[in-house]
Amino acid sequence: MLKYDVIVIGGGHAGVEAAAASARLGVSTLLITLKPDNLGEMSCNPAIGGIAKGTLVKEIDALDGLMGYVIDQAGIHYKMLNETRGPAVWGPRAQADRKLYKKAMYQILTNYPNLDILYGKVEDIEIKSSKVAAIVLNNDSKIPCQKIILTTGTFLSGLIHIGKKKIPAGRVDEEPSYGLSKTLKKVGFKIARLKTGTPPRIDGRTIDYSKTALQPGDKAPRPFSELTNVVNVPQINCFITKTTSETHDIIRENLNKSAMYSGQIEGIGPRYCPSIEDKIVRFSTKSEHRIFLEPEGLDDYTIYPNGISTSLPEDVQHKLIKTIPGLENVKVLRLGYAIEYDYVDPREISVTLETKKIAGLYFAGQINGTTGYEEAAGQGIIAGINAALAVKDQAQFILTRANSYIGVMIDDLTTFGTIEPYRMFTSRSEYRLSLRADNADLRLTELGINIGVISEKRKKIFTKKYEDIEKTKSLLNTLSFTTSKLAKMDIQVAQDGTYKTVLDLFKIPSFNIEQAIKIFPMLKEMQNNNILQLLYIEAKYASYLTRQQADINLFQSEEAQLIPKNIDYFKIPSISLEIQEKLSSHKPTTIGLARRIPGITPAAITSIIIYLKTKYSDGSFT
């Protein structure tokens, strides 16, 4: 009988990262998905990255994940979002050729060491003594394993809505999974419903682009992966149009036919990626909403109209689309729809993504209440790493709010839970100036090397980059001019008679890399080198980063301050009954986690610390 150390159920963005990470750690891994086309399928928009999301992709890449490298084999429109603002909120993004993305992902996974792929459907999980034992396929055959990672996306009791029409499906033309939903309910997991949606797809050959605005990509695409030197995929343009008052009138007149507004849908949709119906209702004073016309491939005429996700009936969808400039004669290739699905309250999992109820069972992706490819992939890689480390009886791998966006996301989910699809934003991170897309590898790759999840190829690239940073830093500390000479170049510095190095000059608010190259022409060769920009950012924001590091040190000290499992909060008289009940319910394992529970006051935290010092004066927990 076949037996695996780790089985991953689901071949979406969470599943492929989980399976690959597990396999990289040397344990036998099986990835089960319905069909080959499902591997890395982009169910909704054909793009990777964005504000905060791009940082997640860079972090996945830093841990030797697949997403960054694969998008570099398929990216057809690269754009750095928010580049006119500070580097903490820069958002690398790339439009993808769907076919190229799936092709690259398939080629990688089907040749991955320690990884097998099975095309089939899992109906049940065999559990013995509150521990996973095997998966059960729809033909009743069993495959034993030590660990299971569920990455089911929108397939758990999935239900598509188009107007009043309901179609049981995990996505278009694919069956939902009822068996696994039943299993999770039987075990006693807290399950609820969420909703997401997608816009209609349209034929680009029938668009009048003269009525739209051109949206070019960056002149020089910046790769996501440290393994990619240059993006060799041809680059194309996107276009922008907008809704009109006529569009809005049609939607308002037909709101009662929308599955979302008729009461037909129970699940809560994503707050920050609303349907067009939701936009018209929530932002009723706006006269127009932008629509991004995004090509789905180099040799594919399908266009993804980003911004008009809808669950309106077929006839209404056709009607409203034709009121949009440039789309008056457009042909609809596929209708938009909403989809409802089951998810599990993420407070049912620990920060390793292992469930608290069942040993050896891990959740990653939309099953935990998140939305987005990048959020799913970030969870997948952590679940895969921890499942494999558990098989090897090694310490678990935990990212924190202080070192990664992935850590912020997991901490938010496991501490607060979510009642709506969770999306990553830069504003969710207290330390976003330190957790930038450009330094993801410097933050995380060494951690990955320490646990053995990083390939030799990436290890060499990382080591070389680290050496190059030190060499460049040394050079920038060597190149200098006197303040008087700099003044003659119209560079405003205090005339104290000292020499100013390039790194000193970078700290001047108005001074930039282009000026440095003008003064020191030898830096021109490094202009396209990410290292020069990295050091520029580090120097420019040095004082802020120093203060933020102090905050991080305080955070880490609180995270290290453990709370015993058997603590009785009702024996701490100086905190209110409400707070005692909250702490007893959440069961935080550290002072840091306790502080982040909504409603827990600073005074209560002080009381807990004093209580622990008094009761456990010898530093031991009983």
From Swiss-Prot:
Residues annotated to bind NAD(+): 269-283
SUPFAM superfamilies assigned to the protein according to its UniProt record, in alphabetical order: FAD/NAD(P)-binding domain (SSF51905)
Residue numbers binding FAD: 10-15, 122, 177, 366
Record GO terms (molecular function): flavin adenine dinucleotide binding
Any one of the GO CC terms: cytosol
Swiss-Prot/TrEMBL cofactor(s): FAD
Domain of life: Bacteria
InterPro entries (UniProt xref): FAD/NAD-bd_sf (IPR036188), GIDA_C_N (IPR049312), MnmG (IPR004416), MnmG-rel (IPR002218), MnmG-rel_CS (IPR020595), MnmG_C (IPR026904), MnmG_C_subdom (IPR047001), MnmG_C_subdom_sf (IPR044920)
Cell compartment(s), UniProt: Cytoplasm
Pfam name, any one: SAM_GIDA_C
UniProt keyword annotations, A-Z: Cytoplasm, FAD, Flavoprotein, NAD, tRNA processing
SMART domains: GIDA_assoc_3
A GO BP entry: tRNA methylation
HAMAP family on file: MnmG_GidA
Family listed: Belongs to the MnmG family.
Function: NAD-binding protein involved in the addition of a carboxymethylaminomethyl (cmnm) group at the wobble position (U34) of certain tRNAs, forming tRNA-cmnm(5)s(2)U34.
Protein name, entry field: tRNA uridine 5-carboxymethylaminomethyl modification enzyme MnmG
Organism of provenance: Rickettsia akari (strain Hartford)
Gene name linked to the record: mnmG
